[in-house]
């Protein structure tokens, strides 16, 4: 086993509680507990964003994962009610170099350690996150475990090795809504960054594979009536809402395992309705169109990924561990965006149907707003399909 330790100045020596991180390949990192006591197992991944830790922690796409933040200072701005992307934290665990016990921000109502404790999230700080990131970049994302109660590396390693791989894992059932509901809250005017239409009289059914709240806010900000439905909702029930378009949301796990979602997308393609997919929804659309997906070595998780194809580049927020295989796309599907770091498919559209999707997150939260126009594009497709009113 490789043993790596680190340091941290968030708490005094007397207040620190030992914690342990063990990876599936036997690497061991010694640090200190942050949050709840206990043991958690999950896929260890890294996020390179310098801001937005609260949005990351509450993003349902991180379900089943232990997130290591490469930015060394976490928690300086505390936690607030407005930046939640779901009703609770979704990560399995948190890894940080340093976690601030005291916060300073006018919107914050509690510290990050208190928030983790409140929601029973196990975390570890004080480790060399740079070394961890370089290791994951070289060897690939892998399962790992954090524990404040099992401090024997061999014992924790045995539990990690027994955990299932993310490849082949369907986690959508853990994050989808259990019943339909209508979302009505637009982006707060305090943070509104685009002059968009506010009344469109358009109904969007959003299939919830683990949807982020800011996606729903952006759709509502463009005047859409948004009906959110569970991931396994049959096509007949979706059509009963008489949608002008259907949105396929982000979410966690291996897209190839979401069989209900893929079959629903295939049925929706036959209706001619405008379809828009983001992240997992993009992958599900690709699979419905006959493409294949594959697992990336360490994924794309951060706020500064350049995407484009020819003359225009967008800086995007990303969070995914799978991608669509470009050589598996049929002749009716056009690649609209590539991730310019590794040339993987970042966007596609159907050549004949009002269907498009992107691998990244145009709603940001956190991240840049370069791609917000995609919501306007979706609205335009729905508007063009509506019958022209008789004068």
UniProtKB/Swiss-Prot annotation:
It catalyses: hydrogencarbonate + L-glutamine + 2 ATP + H2O = carbamoyl phosphate + L-glutamate + 2 ADP + phosphate + 2 H(+). Its EC number is 6.3.5.5. Pathway: Amino-acid biosynthesis; L-arginine biosynthesis; carbamoyl phosphate from bicarbonate: step 1/1; Pyrimidine metabolism; UMP biosynthesis via de novo pathway; (S)-dihydroorotate from bicarbonate: step 1/3. GO terms for molecular function: ATP binding; carbamoyl-phosphate synthase (glutamine-hydrolyzing) activity; glutaminase activity. Pfam families: CPSase_sm_chain, GATase. Residues 1-199 are annotated as: CPSase. It comes from the Bacteria. Gene3D superfamilies: 3.40.50.880, Carbamoyl-phosphate synthase small subunit, N-terminal domain. One of its GO terms (biological process) is 'de novo' UMP biosynthetic process. Residues 203-388 form the Glutamine amidotransferase type-1 domain. PROSITE patterns: GATASE_TYPE_1. Composed of two chains; the small (or glutamine) chain promotes the hydrolysis of glutamine to ammonia, which is used by the large (or ammonia) chain to synthesize carbamoyl phosphate. Tetramer of heterodimers (alpha,beta)4. Small subunit of the glutamine-dependent carbamoyl phosphate synthetase (CPSase). CPSase catalyzes the formation of carbamoyl phosphate from the ammonia moiety of glutamine, carbonate, and phosphate donated by ATP, constituting the first step of 2 biosynthetic pathways, one leading to arginine and/or urea and the other to pyrimidine nucleotides. The small subunit (glutamine amidotransferase) binds and cleaves glutamine to supply the large subunit with the substrate ammonia. HAMAP family: CPSase_S_chain (MF_01209). Belongs to the CarA family. PANTHER family: CARBAMOYL-PHOSPHATE SYNTHASE SMALL CHAIN, MULTIFUNCTIONAL TRYPTOPHAN BIOSYNTHESIS PROTEIN-RELATED. This is Carbamoyl phosphate synthase small chain. It comes from Synechococcus elongatus (strain ATCC 33912 / PCC 7942 / FACHB-805) (Anacystis nidulans R2). The lineage of its organism: Bacteria, Bacillati, Cyanobacteriota, Cyanophyceae, Synechococcales.
């Amino acid at each position: 086993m490789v043993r790596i330790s680190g340091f941290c100045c968030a708490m005094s020596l007397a207040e620190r509680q030992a914690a342990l991180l063990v990876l599936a390949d036997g690497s061991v990192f010694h640090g200190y507990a942050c949050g709840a006591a206990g043991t958690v197992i999950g896929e260890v991944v890294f996020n390179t964003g310098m801001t937005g830790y609260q949005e990351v922690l509450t993003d349902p796409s991180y379900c089943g994962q232990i997130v290591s933040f490469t930015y060394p200072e976490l928690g300086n701005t505390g936690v607030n009610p407005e930046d939640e992307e779901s009703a609770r934290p979704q990560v399995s665990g948190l890894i940080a170099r340093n976690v601030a016990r005291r916060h300073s921000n006018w919107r914050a109502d509690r510290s990050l350690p208190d928030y983790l404790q409140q929601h029973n999230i196990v975390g570890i700080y004080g480790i060399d996150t740079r070394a961890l990131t370089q290791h994951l970049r070289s060897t690939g994302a892998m399962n790992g475990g954090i524990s404040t109660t099992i401090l024997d590396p061999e014992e924790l390693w045995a539990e990690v090795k027994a955990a299932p791989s993310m490849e082949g894992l369907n986690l959508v059932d853990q994050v989808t809504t259990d019943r339909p509901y209508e979302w009505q809250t637009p982006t707060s005017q305090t943070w509104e960054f685009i002059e968009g239409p506010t009344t469109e009289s358009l109904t969007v059914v959003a299939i919830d594979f683990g949807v982020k709240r800011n996606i729903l806010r952006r759709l509502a900000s463009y005047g859409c009536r948004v009906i959110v439905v569970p991931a396994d909702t049959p096509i007949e029930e979706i059509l009963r809402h008489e949608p002008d378009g259907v949105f396929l949301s982000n979410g966690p796990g291996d897209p190839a395992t979401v069989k209900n979602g893929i079959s629903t997308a295939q049925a929706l393609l036959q209706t001619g309705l405008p379809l828009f997919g983001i992240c997992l929804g993009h992958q599900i659309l690709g699979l419905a169109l006959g493409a294949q997906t594959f697992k990336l070595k360490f994924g794309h998780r951060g706020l500064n990924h350049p995407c484009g194809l020819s003359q225009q580049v967008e800086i995007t927020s990303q969070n995914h561990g799978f991608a669509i295989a470009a050589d598996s796309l049929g002749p009716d599907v056009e690649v609209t965006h590539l991730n310019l770091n590794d040339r993987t498919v970042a966007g596609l559209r159907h050549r004949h149907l009002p269907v498009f999707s992107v691998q990244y997150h145009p709603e940001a939260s956190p991240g840049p707003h370069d791609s917000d126009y995609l919501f306007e594009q979706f609205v335009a497709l729905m508007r063009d399909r509506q019958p022209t009113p008789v004068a």
